[in-house]
Curated annotation (Swiss-Prot):
Species name: Chlorokybus atmophyticus (Soil alga)
Gene name of the encoded protein: petG
GO biological process, alphabetically ordered: cytochrome complex assembly; photosynthesis
A cellular-component GO term for this protein: cytochrome b6f complex
Subcellular localization, as worded in the UniProt entry: Plastid, Chloroplast thylakoid membrane
Name this protein carries in UniProt: Cytochrome b6-f complex subunit 5
Length: 37
C-alpha cells in the first residue's frame, strides 16, 4: 500500500530538485557574468 505513494513522491521530487538545481546554477551564472563585466 505504501510503495505506490513512495514512488509517486520520488517521481514528484526528482523534477523539482532538478529544476531547483538548474535555477540556482543559472542564477549563479548570471551573477558571475555580471561581475565579470
Amino acid at each position: 500500500m505504501v510503495e505506490p505513494l513512495l514512488s509517486g513522491i520520488v517521481l514528484g521530487l526528482i523534477p523539482v530538485t532538478l529544476a531547483g538545481l538548474f535555477v540556482t546554477a543559472y542564477l549563479q551564472y548570471r551573477r558571475g557574468d555580471k561581475l565579470n563585466r
